[in-house]
C-alpha cells in the first residue's frame, strides 16, 4: 500500500481501503479516494462480509543455492529435528529404559512403563451394544467413569481401520482417524491405550511440540505414516483451517470428554468451521465419549439436545444397566458435616502485610486467598500461603510480572511504581521468612472443616493402612496448602501428594509441569503417595488407579464435576464423601440439585427411542450457528485454507514469531482496543521488522469481536502483500539478515583447476640476449652448529637486480638448521664476453657434476649464472662488485673439465674431493680420508649401502654395463688407494628436515677414484651448490609473490608476501585439523595472516560504511558489511585479478627448479613434468582466504604515512566496491560528515556526563553528545533524555575496533600460536562476559539511559553478582569467568564507547590502543589462565579428534530449536554428523549446552576407535582420496 494512499485515506476505515484494494475494477472509489487496482487481468481476492469467498494465487517457489553436501547435511539435520520432535512424544514404548528412575524418564516412557491400557480388549455386552450403534451412526456414548468408554473407541477404531485398509487396497485415497483430547496428559494416556490395542501406527501431538510451525508437507508425511493421530483439539482445528488436513482425509473423529463441545471450545469450532462446511459424503464418522453430556446448570434436556445437534450425533447409553453396575460399582456416598465456619478475618501476619504492602498489585491474589483461607482452612493455613507465594524461586517471576505490566504502558509514573513494587516484594519476602509460624496442632490454628478432614483421614488410615484417597479442592492454593499441612501433621500411614493443573505463565508458587503432574500419578499408582490433594485436573479422563476414598473438600458446582469426581472411587466398598457445612442451605441445595440432575439425565438417556433421527434438529443447528453470522471468512481457492475470526489471532501470532532475529525475544502482535461511542475499535500493531506495521479494524459491539475483526483484516493485508502463503503461513522463518550466510556461500572443495606460475617472469625477461652487465646476489650459509664440511658462499648473477630477500632456513647434514642469507649487491658489474663465457662454463659444470644435467653452452639463454664468492677480507669487508667473484676458481674449472686420475697422484690429493659417476646420477661422493688397511680387491665392508656388485670395492664403484665393466676391470690399477667417502643423499628438498626413510640411508662408503670422475669444482662450492635447488625454489617463490603484489599495486615485504600466498595443504584453512596432502618445507602458510587480515577487513569496511551511511541502522550495517567481506566477493575479485596464479600450493619439486629455456644434452628431461605441474586445484575459499592474508601482509608492511595505509589500500583492492574506495587511512576522515546531533552544542547534563567519564577514563570528548549516544539504549524513546540516536551504530563500529586491537595484541605477543588458539583466546577478551564485567568496573552501568524496568533489574542483579565475585576472588583477574552472563547492554556500551572516542578523535586508532592498554590488557597479561575458556571445550576436543586423529573433514555440528515437551521449556537439539551418519545428538535448554552435550557424547562414541575403524564405520574417504569437504561446520567453542 503506497504511503500516499495511506495518508489520503486516514479518515477512512481500513476495511474500506482493503475492499478497494481487492476489487478487480480498474478504479474503485472509497469515499473521496480513488484506489487503483493491482495488475490488470489478474484475478484478485474478493472479500464480502458473511460469505466464504475464494481466490487463486500464484505459487511462490523457494530457491536453494547451498552446495550439495551442505544441503544434504542440513536436510539430514532438519529430518532428525522433526523426527526427534515426534520421538520425544511418540517414543518407542517397546524400548523403555527401565534401568532409569521415574524422575529421569519422559512422560511417554512413564506411560509405557505403567503399561497404561495393556490387555484392555475384553469387551462386555453393553460395550459391544454401543460399539454396534457407533458403527452405524454418529454417536455420543454416555457411560459412567470407569465403565470402559475408551474400549468402545478402540473397537470402533479397529473396525474403521479395517475398512480403511480395504479401501486403500482398492485404490481409494488414504484417510486417517483422529482421537481428540482436551489436555496434554490425556494425549499421552490415550495414545498409550491405543498403541497397546491397535496394530497400526499411532502418533500423538500437542501444541508444545511446535505443531503450529509444521507445513503441509510435514502433515502429509504424518498422514502417510500413521493410521491414528491422537492430539489436542486446537491442533486439528488449525490444520483444517490452514488446509494442511482436509475433512475428506479423515475417516473417524473421536471426541474424548465430548461435553466440552460448546461455545468457542476447539471441539465446537472444528464442527462449526470445518465439519459442517464439508459436504455430507465427505464428513467422517463421529464418536463422542462422556460421563455426562452436559457440564452446566440449567435445562438438562435442552443442553443434551444441543450437544447432539452440535456434534451431529445421537446420545446413547447402555440398556444393560444391571450389567454396567456389575462392572462399575457405585461408591457409598457420605456427607461429612463440619461446624459452621468463622467469617473471614485478618491474621496478625495478614495485618502486617496489608499495612506494609497492601498497595502492591502483584500480591492482590495472595491477599485474597489468605482472607479466604482464614475462614475455610484456618489461621495457620492463611499465614502459610505467604511462605510459598514469596519463596525465592517465585520472586523473579513476580518481578517479571510487575515489569511486564509496567512495560505495557508508556506512563512514567507506572514505571516508577513498578520499581517500587519490586523493592516492596523483596521486603515482603524477607518479612515472611523471618515470621515464626505456630504449630498447626495448637487450638484455633485450623478451621472446623480442616479439623474434620484430619479426623476422618486419621480414622480411615488407622483402620485401613492400604487406603488410597483423593481429596478434591476448588483452588490450587488450597490443594498445595493442605498438602503441606498434612505433610507436617504426619498422620500414620498417610503419604500425601499434590496434583494440580498446568497453567502457563502462572506465578505465586503454583507452577507445575505436565511431567510433574504425571509423576504424581505414577507415585499414586505405586503407592508411594496414597493421599492426593487435587484440583479438577484429576476429575476428568486421567487414568487414576482405583481409590477407596474420594473426598470433595470443596463441593462440586455442576453435574459433570459430581459424576467425574465420584467416578474416581472405583474400588469395591469405596466411599465418596462430600464435605458440607452444617445448616448451610446452599450446600444442601447443591447436593439435592446434582442428584436430581443425574436422575433426569439417566431417564433421558434410557428413554431415547431406538429409531430417533436428527432431521428435526436442523433448526437447532441454525440457532447454534446463528451467532457466527457477520463474521467473515476467507478461503484460498488453490489450497482450501480458510481464514476465520478465531484463526486470525493464531495466524498473526505465528507471523509475528517468524520475524524473530537471532537472539531477540520472540516478537508479538500487539492489540490496542479503544471505545468509540457505543462500539469498540482495535488497532493491530505488528513487530517493527514486519513490512506491514498493522491497521485499525472496523467498529464492533464487543471487545473480542473488534480484536478478531482487526486480526482478520490484518491477515488479509498480509496476504495482499504476499507475506502469508497459501496456507496462511509466514513467508519468513525466524528470519536472519539477508545474505547473512554470504561468508559461507562458496565451497572450499577442489572443484576447479587453475593456472599456477612455476617461474617468476624475471627469468624470461631479456632471455636470448647476451648481457653486458650482471647484478649479484650473495648466498651465504650460517649454520646453527658446525657442519661436517665447509660451505663457501656463492653468487647468483642476474640480468636485473633482485629485490632484498629475507633469510630463511634449510636443513643440512643431520638436520642442522642453517640460515640462508641472501643479499643483493647495490651495483651491477660490467663483464666481457670472455668473462661471461667463463661464468657460463662454471654454471653448466655445476649442473653436470652436481646435478647430472648436461646443457648446451648457450650464454644468451641462461636465466642466471652461478659463481663462487670470495670470502670477507681480514677486516670483515667485502671486495667490490667484480672482486666478489672468485675468478681463480672460475678459471680453474673452465680450464679443467675434471681432475684426471693417474697412478702418479699422491693419495692425499684424493682426499677432500667431490667425485661423481658420469653414468649414474645417484653416485656423488665427498672423500674423507685414505683407508690404509683396505685394497681395491677387498670386498666392501658390510656397513656400506647395498649395490648390484658387491664382490670387491673396485667393482662396487663401477656402474658400467657387462662388457664395458670387464674391459675396465682388466685394465684398471688395482693397487690404487681405497678412500672413505660420504655418499651424497638424493635428497633435494633441504627446506625441510629429513624424513624417516631418508634418515635410514647409510651414507658411509669405501670407493676407488679411477671408476669415478674427480670434479674440478671445490668441495666447499659443491656442498653449497647441493643446497641450491632448495634455495632457488624459495627465491622463485619470493619473486612470484612479489609479482602478485606488483600486479595489485601493493607494497609488501617479500617474507609477508610469500607467507600470504602459501597454502601448504589441501585444508590449510582448517586449523589444527590433520593436514591433507601436506607440502613439506614451504615455510609459514597464510593462516595467521588471514586471521589478521580478516579482522582488519572487518574493521576497515565497518569504518567505511559508518562514515558513508549515517542513517543506516545496525541491521543494515551488518548486512552491507557481509556483502563486502564475504568470501564470494573476495573470490570474484581474486579471480578477476588472477590471484590464483601466484598462490604457492606445492612444495619443492625435483622437476621444476631447473632453469627454463636451455637445451638439454644429457640427463632426464623434466619439461613434461613441468607442464603437468602448471595447474593446481584450489577451493574458492582458499583463494578468498589468500586475499585476506594479503591484507594482513599489507598491514604488517606499514604505509607511507600511517601504518594502516597499505592495509586500507588492500581492502579497497579486494572488496572492489564504491562502498570502500579509499587508499589511505586519512581518507576515512574526509568521508565522514558529522551528523547534526554530534555537533550540536552540548547541554549541561551532557557536559556533566562527559566530565564524569573523563575523570574515570581520561579521555576528553570534543563532542560530548557522542558519549550520550553511546549510553542510550535502543529502548529509549527518541524524544527522551539526550535526544540522540541509540548506541547501536557506535557499537557496530566499536565492535570491529575492539576486535582489531585485541587481535593485533595477540598476534604480536604470540608469534608461534595458530589461528585457532588466537581465536579462542581473543574470544575471552571480546566476550560479553568480560565486557560486561569491565562495564561495571568502569561504572558504565550507572550512565545507561534505558526505558525498560526488567533491564534495570537485570543490571542490578548482575552488578551485585560481579562485584561479589570480584571481592571474593582475592585479586584474581579472571573473576568474571565464574559469573553469569551480563545483560547484553553492558558489553554493548563498552563497544559503543570505543566507537564514540574513535569518531571524536578524528578516527585515531591510537585512542583505542590506549584504552586497550589501560583497561583491558591488565586482565590478559597471562593468557594461560584462559586456556580453559575455549580450548578445553568439548566441541574443540571433538574438532581436534575428528580432524587430527581421523583425518576427516566432512563433518558438522548442527543445532536447532525443539518444541517444549512434557511441560518443560523449549529445548535445543544438537547433532554431530560425520559424512552421512549422525554420530551423536543431545538436547538442552540452549544451543551452547546442547552442542557441549552432543560433542561429549560423540567423544564417547569415538573413544577407542582406530582410524581405519572410523573410516569403515562412517565411510570416510577424506584421507584416502584427499578430497577435502567444505570447512567443517563444527560451531564455536563459545
Curated annotation (Swiss-Prot):
- Which EC number applies? 3.1.26.-, 3.6.4.-
Q: Where is the PAZ domain?
A: 888-1016
Site residues, Important for activity: 1384
Q: Where is the DRBM domain?
A: 1436-1504
Region: Disordered; residue ranges are 36-70
Listed Acidic residues bias regions: 51-60
**Domain Helicase C-terminal, first and last residues per copy:** 456-613
User: Which InterPro entries does this chain map to?
Assistant: Dicer_dimer_sf (IPR038248), Dicer_dimerisation_dom (IPR005034), DSRM_2 (IPR056755), Helicase/UvrB_N (IPR006935), Helicase_ATP-bd (IPR014001), Helicase_C-like (IPR001650), P-loop_NTPase (IPR027417), PAZ_dom (IPR003100)
- Span of domain Dicer dsRNA-binding fold: 648-738
Ranges where the RNase III domain occurs? 1054-1199, 1250-1402
Q: Where is this motif: DEAH box?
A: 256-259
Q: Residue limits of the Helicase ATP-binding domain? A: 130-311
Q: Name one Pfam family in it.
A: Ribonuclease_3
Q: What does this protein do?
A: Dicer-like endonuclease involved in cleaving double-stranded RNA in the RNA interference (RNAi) pathway. Produces 21 to 25 bp dsRNAs (siRNAs) which target the selective destruction of homologous RNAs leading to sequence-specific suppression of gene expression, called post-transcriptional gene silencing (PTGS). Part of a broad host defense response against viral infection and transposons.
Protein name per Swiss-Prot or TrEMBL: Dicer-like protein 1
At the highest ranks, the source species' classification is: Eukaryota, Fungi, Dikarya, Ascomycota, Pezizomycotina
Q: Gene name on record? A: dcl1
Amino acid at each position: 500500500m503506497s504511503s500516499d494512499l495511506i495518508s489520503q485515506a486516514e479518515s477512512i476505515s481500513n476495511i474500506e481501503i482493503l475492499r478497494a484494494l481487492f476489487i478487480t475494477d480498474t478504479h474503485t472509489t472509497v469515499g473521496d479516494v480513488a484506489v487503483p487496482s493491482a495488475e490488470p487481468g489478474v484475478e484478485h481476492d474478493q472479500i464480502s462480509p458473511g460469505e466464504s469467498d475464494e481466490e487463486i494465487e500464484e505459487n511462490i517457489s523457494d530457491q536453494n543455492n547451498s552446495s550439495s553436501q551442505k544441503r544434504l547435511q542440513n536436510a539430514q539435520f532438519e529430518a532428525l529435528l522433526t523426527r526427534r520432535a515426534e520421538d520425544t512424544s511418540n517414543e518407542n514404548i517397546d524400548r523403555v529404559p527401565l534401568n532409569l528412575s521415574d524422575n529421569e524418564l519422559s512422560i511417554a516412557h512413564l506411560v509405557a512403563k505403567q503399561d497404561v491400557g495393556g490387555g484392555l480388549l475384553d469387551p462386555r455386552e453393553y460395550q459391544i451394544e454401543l460399539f454396534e450403534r457407533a458403527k452405524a451412526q454418529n454417536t455420543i456414548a454416555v457411560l459412567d467413569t470407569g465403565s470402559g468408554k475408551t474400549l468402545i473407541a478402540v473397537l470402533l477404531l479397529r473396525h474403521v481401520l479395517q475398512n480403511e485398509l480395504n479401501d486403500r487396497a482398492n485404490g481409494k485415497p488414504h484417510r486417517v482417524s483422529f482421537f481428540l483430547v482436551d489436555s496434554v496428559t490425556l494425549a499421552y494416556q490415550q495414545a498409550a491405550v491405543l498403541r497397546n490395542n491397535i496394530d497400526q501406527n499411532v502418533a500423538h501431538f500437542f501444541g508444545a511440540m511446535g505443531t503450529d510451525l509444521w507445513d503441509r508437507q510435514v502433515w502429509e508425511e504424518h498422514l502417510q505414516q500413521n493410521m491414528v493421530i491422537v492430539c489436542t483439539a486446537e491442533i486439528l482445528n488449525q490444520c483444517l483451517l490452514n488446509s494442511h488436513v482436509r475433512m475428506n482425509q479423515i475417516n473417524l473423529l473421536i471426541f474424548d470428554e465430548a461435553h466440552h463441545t460448546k461455545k468457542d471450545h476447539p471441539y465446537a469450532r472444528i464442527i462449526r468451521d470445518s465439519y459442517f462446511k464439508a459436504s455430507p459424503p465427505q464428513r467422517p464418522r463421529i464418536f463422542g465419549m462422556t460421563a455426562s453430556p452436559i457440564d452446566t446448570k440449567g435445562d438438562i434436556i435442552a443442553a443434551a439436545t444441543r450437544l447432539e445437534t452440535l456434534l451431529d450425533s445421537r446420545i446413547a447409553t447402555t440398556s444393560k444397566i444391571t450389567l454396567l453396575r456389575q462392572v462399575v460399582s457405585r461408591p457409598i456416598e457420605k456427607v461429612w458435616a463440619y461446624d459452621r465456619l468463622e467469617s473471614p478475618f485478618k491474621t496478625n501476619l495478614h495485618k502486617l502485610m496489608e499495612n506494609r504492602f497492601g498497595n502492591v498489585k502483584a500480591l492482590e491474589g495472595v491477599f485474597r486467598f489468605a482472607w479466604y483461607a482464614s475462614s475455610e482452612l484456618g489461621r495457620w493455613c492463611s499465614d502459610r500461603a505467604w511462605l510459598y507465594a514469596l519463596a525465592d524461586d517465585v520472586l523473579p517471576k513476580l518481578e517479571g510480572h510487575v515489569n511486564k505490566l509496567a512495560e505495557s504502558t508508556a506512563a512514567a509514573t507506572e514505571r516508577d511504581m513498578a520499581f517500587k513494587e519490586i523493592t516492596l516484594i523483596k521486603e515482603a519476602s524477607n518479612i515472611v521468612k523471618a515470621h515464626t509460624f505456630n504449630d498447626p496442632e495448637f487450638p484455633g490454628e485450623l478451621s472446623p472443616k480442616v479439623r474434620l478432614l484430619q479426623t476422618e483421614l486419621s480414622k480411615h488410615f488407622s483402620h485401613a493402612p492400604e487406603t488410597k484417597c483423593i481429596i478434591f479442592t476448588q483452588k490450587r492454593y488450597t490443594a498445595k496448602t493442605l498438602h503441606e499441612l498434612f505433610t507436617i501433621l504426619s498422620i500414620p500411614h498417610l503419604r500425601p501428594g499434590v496434583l494440580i493443573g498446568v497453567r502457563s505463565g502462572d506465578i505465586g508458587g503454583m507452577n507445575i509441569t505436565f511431567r510433574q503432574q504425571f509423576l504424581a500419578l505414577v507415585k499414586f499408582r505405586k503407592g508411594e503417595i496414597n493421599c492426593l490433594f487435587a484440583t479438577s485436573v484429576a476429575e476428568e479422563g486421567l487414568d487414576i488407579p482405583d481409590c477407596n476414598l474420594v473426598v470433595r473438600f470443596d463441593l462440586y458446582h455442576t453435574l459433570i464435576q459430581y459424576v467425574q469426581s465420584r467416578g474416581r472411587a472405583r474400588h469395591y466398598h469405596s466411599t465418596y464423601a462430600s464435605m458440607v457445612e452444617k445448616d448451610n442451605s446452599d450446600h444442601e441445595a447443591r447436593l439435592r440439585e446434582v442428584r436430581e440432575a443425574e436422575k433426569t439425565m439417566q431417564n433421558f438417556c434410557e428413554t431415547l427411542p431406538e429409531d430417533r433421527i436428527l432431521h428435526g434438529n436442523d433448526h437447532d443447528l441454525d440457532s447454534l450457528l446463528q451467532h457466527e453470522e457477520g463474521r467473515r471468512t476467507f478461503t484460498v481457492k488453490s489450497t482450501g485454507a480458510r481464514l476465520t475470526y478465531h484463526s486470525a489471532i493464531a495466524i498473526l501470532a505465528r507471523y509475528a514469531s517468524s520475524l524473530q532475529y537471532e537472539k531477540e525475544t520472540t516478537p508479538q502482535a500487539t492489540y490496542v482496543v479503544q471505545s468509540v461511542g457505543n462500539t469498540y475499535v482495535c488497532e493491530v500493531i505488528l513487530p517493527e521488522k514486519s513490512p506491514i506495521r498493522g491497521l485499525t479494524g472496523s467498529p464492533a459491539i464487543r471487545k473480542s469481536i473488534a480484536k478478531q475483526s482487526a486480526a482478520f483484516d490484518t491477515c488479509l493485508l498480509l496476504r495482499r502483500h504476499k507475506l502469508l502463503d497459501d496456507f496462511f503461513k509466514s513467508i519468513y522463518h525466524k528470519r536472519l539478515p539477508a545474505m547473512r550466510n554470504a561468508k559461507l556461500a562458496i565451497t572450499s572443495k577442489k572443484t576447479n583447476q587453475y593456472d599456477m606460475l612455476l617461474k617468476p617472469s624475471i627469468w624470461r625477461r631479456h632471455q636470448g640476449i647476451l648481457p653486458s652487465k650482471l647484478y649479484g646476489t650473495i648466498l651465504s650459509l650460517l649454520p646453527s652448529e658446525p657442519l661436517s664440511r665447509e660451505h663457501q658462499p656463492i653468487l647468483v648473477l642476474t640480468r636485473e637486480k633482485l629485490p632484498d630477500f629475507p633469510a630463511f632456513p634449510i636443513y643440512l647434514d643431520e638436520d642442522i638448521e642453517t640460515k640462508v642469507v641472501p643479499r643483493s649487491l647495490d651495483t651491477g658489474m660490467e663483464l666481457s664476453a670472455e668473462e661471461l663465457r667463463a661464468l657460463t662454463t662454471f654454471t653448466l659444470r655445476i649442473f653436470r657434476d652436481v646435478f647430472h644435467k648436461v646443457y648446451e653452452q648457450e650464454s644468451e639463454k641462461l636465466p642466471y649464472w652461478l659463481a663462487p664468492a670470495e670470502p670477507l677480507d681480514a677486516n670483515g669487508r667485502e671486495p667490490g662488485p667484480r672482486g666478489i667473484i672468485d675468478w681463480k676458481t672460475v678459471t680453474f674449472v673452465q680450464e679443467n673439465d675434471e681432475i684426471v686420475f693417474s697412478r702418479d697422484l699422491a693419495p692425499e690429493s684424493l682426499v677432500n674431493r667431490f667425485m661423481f659417476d658420469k653414468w649414474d646420477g645417484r653416485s656423488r661422493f665427498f672423500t674423507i680420508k685414505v683407508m690404509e688397511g683396505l685394497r681395491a680387491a677387498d670386498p666392501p665392508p658390510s656397513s656400506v649401502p647395498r649395490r648390484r656388485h658387491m664382490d670387491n670395492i673396485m667393482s662396487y664403484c663401477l656402474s658400467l654395463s657387462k662388457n664395458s665393466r670387464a674391459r675396465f676391470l682388466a685394465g684398471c690399477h688395482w693397487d690404487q688407494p681405497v678412500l672413505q667417502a660420504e655418499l651424497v643423499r638424493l635428497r633435494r628438498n633441504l627446506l625441510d628436515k629429513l624424513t624417516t626413510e631418508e634418515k635410514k640411508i647409510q651414507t658411509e662408503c669405501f670407493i676407488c677414484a679411477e671408476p669415478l670422475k674427480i670434479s674440478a669444482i671445490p668441495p666447499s662450492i659443491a656442498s653449497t651448490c647441493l643446497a641450491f635447488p632448495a634455495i632457488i625454489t624459495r627465491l622463485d617463490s619470493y619473486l612470484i609473490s612479489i609479482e602478485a603484489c606488483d600486479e595489485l599495486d601493493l607494497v609488501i615485504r617479500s617474507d609477508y608476501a610469500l607467507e600470504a600466498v602459501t597454502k601448504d595443504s589441501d585444508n590449510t584453512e582448517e586449523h589444527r585439523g590433520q593436514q591433507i596432502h601436506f607440502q613439506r618445507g614451504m615455510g609459514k602458510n597464510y593462516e595467521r595472516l588471514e586471521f589478521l587480515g580478516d579482522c582488519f577487513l572487518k574493521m576497515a569496511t565497518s569504518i567505511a560504511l559508518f562514515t558513508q551511511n549515517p542513517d543506516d541502522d545496525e541491521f543494515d550495517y551488518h548486512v552491507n558489511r557481509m556483502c563486502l567481506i564475504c568470501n564470494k566477493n573476495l573470490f570474484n575479485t581474486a579471480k578477476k585479478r588472477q590471484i590464483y596464479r601466484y598462490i604457492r600450493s606445492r612444495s619443492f619439486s625435483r622437476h621444476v627448479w631447473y632453469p627454463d629455456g636451455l637445451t638439454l644434452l644429457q640427463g632426464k628431461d623434466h619439461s613434461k613434468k613441468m607442464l603437468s605441474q602448471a595447474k593446481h586445484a584450489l577451493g574458492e575459499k582458499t583463494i578468498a582466504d589468500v586475499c585476506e592474508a594479503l591484507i594482513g601482509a599489507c598491514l604488517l608492511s606499514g604505509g607511507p604515512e600511517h601504518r594502516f595505509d597499505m592495509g586500507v589500500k588492500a581492502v579497497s583492492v579486494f572488496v572492489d566496491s564504491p562502498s570502500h574506495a579509499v587508499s589511505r587511512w586519512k581518507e576515512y576522515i574526509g568521508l565522514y560528515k558529522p551528523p547534526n546531533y554530534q555537533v550540536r552544542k552540548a547541554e549541561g547534563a551532557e557536559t556533566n556526563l562527559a566530565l564524569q567519564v573523563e575523570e574515570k577514563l581520561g579521555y576528553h570528548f570534543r563532542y560530548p553528545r557522542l558519549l550520550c549516544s553511546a549510553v542510550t539504549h535502543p529502548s529509549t524513546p527518541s524524544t527522551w533524555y539526550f535526544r540522540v540516536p541509540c548506541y547501536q551504530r557506535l557499537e557496530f563500529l566499536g565492535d570491529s575496533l575492539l576486535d582489531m586491537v585485541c587481535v593485533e595484541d595477540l598476534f604480536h605477543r604470540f608469534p608461534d600460536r595458530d589461528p585457532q588458539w588466537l581465536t579462542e583466546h581473543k574470544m575471552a577478551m571480546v566476550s560479553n562476559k568480560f565486557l560486561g564485567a569491565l562495564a561495571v568496573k568502569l561504572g558504565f552501568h550507572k550512565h545507561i539511559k534505558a526505558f525498560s524496568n526488567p533491564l534495570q533489574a537485570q543490571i542490578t542483579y548482575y552488578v551485585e553478582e560481579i562485584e561479589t565475585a570480584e571481592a571474593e576472588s582475592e585479586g584474581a583477574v579472571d573473576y568474571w569467568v565464574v559469573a553469569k552472563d551480563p545483560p547484553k547492554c553492558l558489553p554493548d556500551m563498552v563497544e559503543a564507547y570505543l566507537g564514540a572516542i574513535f569518531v571524536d578523535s578524528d578516527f585515531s586508532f591510537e585512542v583505542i590502543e590506549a584504552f586497550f592498554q589501560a583497561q583491558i590488557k591488565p586482565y590478559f597479561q597471562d593468557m594461560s589462565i584462559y586456556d580453559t575458556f575455549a580450548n578445553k571445550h568439548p566441541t574443540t576436543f571433538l574438532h581436534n579428534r575428528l580432524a587430527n586423529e581421523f583425518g576427516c573433514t566432512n563433518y558438522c555440528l548442527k543445532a536447532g530449536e525443539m518444541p517444549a515437551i512434557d511441560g518443560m521449556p523449549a529445548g535445543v537439539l544438537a547433532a554431530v554428523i560425520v559424512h552421512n551418519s549422525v554420530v551423536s545428538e543431545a538436547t538442552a535448554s540452549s544451543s551452547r549446552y546442547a552442542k557441549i552435550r552432543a560433542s561429549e557424547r560423540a567423544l564417547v562414541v569415538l573413544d577407542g576407535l582406530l582410524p581405519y575403524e572410523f573410516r569403515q564405520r562412517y565411510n570416510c574417504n577424506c584421507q584416502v582420496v584427499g578430497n577435502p569437504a567444505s570447512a567443517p561446520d563444527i560451531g564455536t567453542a563459545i
